[in-house]
Amino acid sequence: MKRTYQPSRVKRKRTHGFLVRMRTKSGRRIIANRRRKGRKRLAV
């Protein structure tokens, strides 16, 4: 049986990257929340 996590750097960036987050209103909210919380990494 195949494992569910098949890492791919490209896919990771394209779905969870910073630029992708900034593209939508909700994505910007995610970044803002992470900034407020003081996360070291805002996005992948």
Curated annotation (Swiss-Prot):
InterPro entries: Ribosomal_bL34, Ribosomal_bL34_CS
BP GO terms, sorted: translation
UniProt name for this protein: Large ribosomal subunit protein bL34
The family this protein is said to belong to: Belongs to the bacterial ribosomal protein bL34 family.
Keyword Ribosomal protein: yes
PANTHER family from the UniProt entry: LARGE RIBOSOMAL SUBUNIT PROTEIN BL34M, MITOCHONDRIAL RIBOSOMAL PROTEIN 34 FAMILY MEMBER
GO MF annotations in UniProt: structural constituent of ribosome
Taxonomic path: Bacteria, Thermotogati, Thermotogota, Thermotogae, Kosmotogales
GO cellular component: ribonucleoprotein complex; ribosome
Signal peptide span: none
Keywords: Ribonucleoprotein, Ribosomal protein
Pfam families per record: Ribosomal_L34
